[in-house]
């Protein structure tokens, strides 16, 4: 394979990545703010922790630190345009809920809403944060997960024949999975 | 959308996720160890940081802390079986390089090799670590990124018509992207 070597930062080599939308309660403006994040990952099984990178300059960062909680909303490919818009607007300047007529779901445990359009939603309590270069890794403990009843199979695996998860590819482009490519490999050495 | 509420941990709601294989030098055994990780994320642009969750009980954890460096290898869908096997074998018990006849690429900056089969590889120096529940988030500063010359377009975006990135879906299942689904949405409110 012909290769090229390059400095870090010049390629989106770590994409595609699943998009999740972080929700934060904005008491001051009597609304909530929603921002798409792809630099995010589960961090622990026990306790169940999930981390999301947020720039300290954002309204989301300010709100999560203030309220001590956040929600995660996972959306399908059909919501690419909405997600893109959420990423372009600033919660400091615009009430995104109002401007985009977002339909919200109230929290069951937390008091921060999530997006009704999501096929999976989680409520998190902020339990820790780590400064990582120019971002803050917000560490949330998962309190409750709500999923569309038809979205997952009995093993808890996403049904790609029913849900087309939204993945970010870099450069303002989005993509989803190919359900026909799904495979359960036979490990080398399996008999 | 009919919903069900559930305790965290009972659904793979945060999948699919891009697979990356962490490489660590094993001086003691004069080999290297490779383990697939999906709980991983970029953490910062400047400096360029990448974080990967590793259980403290693993050989990878031991080796990365000892050597202070690790590599990342991103593989295509065709390597699902290899990745699955790398995840099943323990580096404490087996020399995976030997057992699986892995072809390695030496590092350019670090001295830890990566997998030659990868379409993208990165070399990281361990700069920090955070205990997150039952995992350690290893924080690496990206030193060098090497990519297959044909894998990315001029904007640095992965060419899905050429590369089928390997995504983990949970439950021992893998999937890749659908290149025909790629879109660059027009933001709501764009004129």
PLM segments and residue spans:
Chain A
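Basic, polyanion-binding surface patches
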Residues: 1-191
